[in-house]
């Protein structure tokens, strides 16, 4: 069909929608209705479908995400993209000021910017059109995430004539608190793992292979720096320039003439922190004068002219209404706090972790208390303390029940006197948790078999134990509410795929008490086959580094229970094929690793798995026995400790080279 539009009209329509996007997403002052906007966008897509040769790189349709990629190419940064050192106390902050004054010979002006808890990116414009976006990576090279960055509505795809022709901006990609809550609600609805925090969600979204899927999540960005010949000498003035060029700059950057003003501003921002629409974990303090920045220079990893002052985790005060006891897959009873709902870090919190009975006793937590709740990097908040001044009269110390809250059989207390366990192998709570864990991401990784679906199949009588997973039929799945043909096909396909499982994952999936991912990997590396693991004696097991008496006894006891042996044999008869382990022979064999900071290419869990698969060990703290510290973005105190001990430090890229 012949188009009734000219190319000039097409370009004019692009400009109109571009202006609408700027008013809506940057100025938050729309001038047309959502309906009118949608009609314009439909018109644009129709024209581009008829005339694909007209489509420009800055077309608003580029934000819809039309690329699916199998990878993210690694590209060198034109300018190093280093991280910023952290300070957690005023003492560390004054040490930073002292170093600056000692080098410069005077007290400079400082610019303060809120430290949004997101993902740093570099975005390049040529002829004022967005042509490339890279992740931070190792600071020297990053991944090309251009397609996903284009989906950010507040980011201009084309700059006005007032902006430089060639420009690179640095920014933080993030989710607002409200959007993050919506994303996790969608994850729960789909029975997928929730994101621990907005930063993880943003990082995961930028790594989505489908830009169309990324576009649906509504990422945002705040620009914190620019590289252009037209830049002024003041960093603060350059941020104002970025705003004039159409970039979003959140948080009203401040210019401070004195150190006293800097410190006062830090306190003011902390007070206002909870009211911000996005998560922040501190304030970035930068020497304002660009020439001073050049004098101060940089280390291999950090700029010497900037510091991130980190705030303590956000805390909320609320009432502990009850303590609920949950039963896990190994039968361990875990107390969970039921709270009077309170808003914390932008989300509504009604439950919090209490860990165990000893922790409750140590903190003297009682039902009816006013408690303090914090949410760090975890999904579930924690009760960190009690306001004793507000304790009501008549409260009683809490004690663990003597009977399982699900099957009502008497519980047993472990020799460590911390763990209380329901030993009834038929307890429905424990059975459902075992099946759910068996299907989970760290085990067989069977898609769409989350807690709700597993519970429904159990209640329907379709499954009674783990081996029944491999006998699930199409008729069984049709009884699950919401399951249609496509979902059913996907589940059955995923179950079939899970029948071929590496030895370490199968051992993990069994859920042997005290045997986690690391222990399962150690067993697989040592014995190479399931038969050898099952036949191992106590002495055989104790000879493996990292397997102590308690773990060895648990493994032997597990494989001496007839019902466990029978279930494993049933799985094998149903076509489960356990892939033998090939002993690692890399330079990682036997080496002890510790990881600090946020990795760009791998999740923490993936990095730990790769290290273990190559025969290495992963620890949680740095000591003289640590062979390597792997450092990601925003490393913690472990880096300082490693430097003091002379522990070799690896970047993420160096780790990958060592592994492969």
Swiss-Prot record:
GO terms for cellular component: cytosol. Pfam families: BRCT, DNA_ligase_aden, DNA_ligase_OB, DNA_ligase_ZBD, HHH_2. Zn(2+) binds at residues 404, 407, 422, 427. Signal peptide: none annotated. The gene is ligA. Belongs to the NAD-dependent DNA ligase family. LigA subfamily. Transmembrane segments: none annotated. SUPFAM superfamilies: BRCT domain (SSF52113), DNA ligase/mRNA capping enzyme, catalytic domain (SSF56091), Nucleic acid-binding proteins (SSF50249), RuvA domain 2-like (SSF47781). It comes from the Bacteria. It catalyses: NAD(+) + (deoxyribonucleotide)n-3'-hydroxyl + 5'-phospho-(deoxyribonucleotide)m = (deoxyribonucleotide)n+m + AMP + beta-nicotinamide D-nucleotide. Its cofactor is Mg(2+); Mn(2+). GO terms for molecular function: DNA binding; DNA ligase (NAD+) activity; metal ion binding. GO terms for biological process: DNA repair; DNA replication. The active site is at 115 (n6-amp-lysine intermediate). This is DNA ligase. Residues 583-660 form the BRCT domain. The lineage of its organism: Bacteria, Pseudomonadati, Chlamydiota, Chlamydiia, Chlamydiales. NAD(+) binds at residues 34-38, 83-84, 113, 136, 172, 286, 310. Disulfide bonds: none annotated. Keywords: DNA damage, DNA repair, DNA replication, Ligase, Magnesium, Manganese, Metal-binding, NAD, Zinc. DNA ligase that catalyzes the formation of phosphodiester linkages between 5'-phosphoryl and 3'-hydroxyl groups in double-stranded DNA using NAD as a coenzyme and as the energy source for the reaction. It is essential for DNA replication and repair of damaged DNA. InterPro entries: BRCT_dom, BRCT_dom_sf, DisA/LigA_HHH, DNA_ligase, DNA_ligase_AS, DNA_ligase_CS, DNAligase_adenylation, DNAligase_N. Its EC number is 6.5.1.2.
């Amino acid at each position: 069909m012949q188009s009734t539009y000219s190319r000039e009209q097409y370009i004019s329509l692009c400009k109109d929608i571009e202006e609408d996007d700027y008013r809506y997403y940057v100025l938050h002052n729309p001038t047309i209705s959502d309906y009118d906007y949608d009609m314009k966008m439909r018109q644009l897509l129709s024209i581009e479908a008829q005339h694909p040769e007209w489509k420009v790189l800055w077309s608003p349709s580029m934000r819809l995400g039309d690329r699916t990629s199998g990878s993210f190419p690694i590209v060198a940064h034109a300018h190093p993209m280093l991280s910023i050192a952290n300070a957690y106390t005023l003492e560390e902050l004054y040490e930073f000021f002292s170093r600056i004054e000692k080098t410069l010979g005077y007290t400079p002006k400082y610019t303060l910017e809120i430290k949004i808890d997101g993902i740093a990116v570099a975005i390049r414009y040529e002829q004022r059109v967005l042509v490339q976006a890279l992740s931070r990576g190792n600071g020297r090279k990053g991944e090309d995430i251009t397609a996903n960055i284009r989906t950010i509505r507040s980011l201009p795809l084309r700059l006005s004539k007032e902006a430089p022709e060639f420009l690179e901006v640095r920014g933080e990609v993030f989710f607002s608190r409200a959007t993050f809550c919506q994303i996790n609600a969608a994850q729960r609805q789909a029975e997928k793992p929730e994101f621990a925090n907005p930063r993880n969600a943003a990082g995961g979204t930028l790594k989505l292979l489908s830009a169309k899927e990324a576009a649906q999540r509504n990422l945002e960005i705040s620009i914190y720096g620019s590289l252009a010949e037209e830049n002024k000498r003041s960093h603060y003035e350059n941020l104002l320039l970025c705003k004039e060029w159409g970039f979003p700059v959140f948080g009203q950057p401040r210019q401070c003439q004195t150190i006293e003003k800097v410190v006062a501003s830090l306190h003011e921002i902390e007070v206002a922190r909870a009211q911000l629409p996005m998560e922040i974990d501190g304030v970035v303090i930068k020497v304002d004068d660009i020439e001073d920045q050049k004098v101060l220079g940089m280390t291999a990893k950090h700029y010497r002219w900037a510091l991130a002052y980190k705030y303590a985790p956000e805390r909320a005060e609320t009432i502990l209404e009850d303590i609920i006891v949950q039963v896990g897959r190994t039968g361990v009873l875990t107390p969970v706090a039921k709270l009077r709902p309170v808003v914390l870090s932008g989300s509504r919190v009604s439950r919090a972790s209490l860990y165990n009975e000893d922790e409750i006793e140590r903190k003297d937590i009682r039902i009816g208390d006013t408690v303090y709740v914090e949410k760090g990097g975890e999904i579930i908040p924690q009760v960190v303390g009690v306001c004793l001044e507000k304790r009501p009269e008549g409260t009683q110390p809490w004690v663990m029940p003597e009977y399982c809250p699900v099957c009502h059989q008497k519980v047993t207390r472990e020799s460590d006197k911390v763990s209380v366990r329901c030993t009834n192998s038929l307890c429905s709570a424990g059975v459902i948790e075992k099946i759910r864990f068996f299907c989970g991401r760290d085990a067989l990784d069977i898609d769409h078999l989350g807690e709700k679906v597993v519970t429904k199949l159990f209640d329907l009588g379709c499954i009674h134990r783990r081996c029944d997973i491999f006998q699930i039929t199409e008729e069984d799945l049709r009884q699950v509410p919401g399951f249609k043909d496509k979902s059913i096909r996907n589940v059955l396909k995923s179950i079939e795929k899970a029948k071929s499982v590496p030895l370490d994952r199968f051992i993990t999936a069994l859920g042997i008490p005290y045997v986690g991912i690391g222990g399962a990997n150690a067993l697989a590396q040592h014995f190479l086959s399931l038969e050898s693991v099952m036949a191992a004696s106590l002495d055989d097991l104790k000879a493996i580094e990292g397997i102590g008496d308690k773990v060895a006894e648990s493994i032997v006891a597990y494989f001496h229970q007839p019902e466990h042996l029978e279930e494993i044999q049933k799985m094998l008869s149903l076509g489960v094929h356990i892939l033998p382990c090939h002993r690692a022979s890399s330079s990682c064999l036997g080496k002890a690793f510790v990881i600090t900071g946020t990795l760009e290419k791998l999740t923490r869990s993936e990095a730990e798995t790769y290290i273990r698969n190559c025969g290495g060990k992963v620890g949680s703290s740095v000591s003289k026995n640590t062979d390597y510290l792997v450092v990601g973005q925003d490393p913690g105190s472990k880096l300082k400790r490693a430097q003091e001990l002379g522990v070799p430090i690896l970047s993420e890229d160096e780790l990958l080279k060592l592994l492969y």
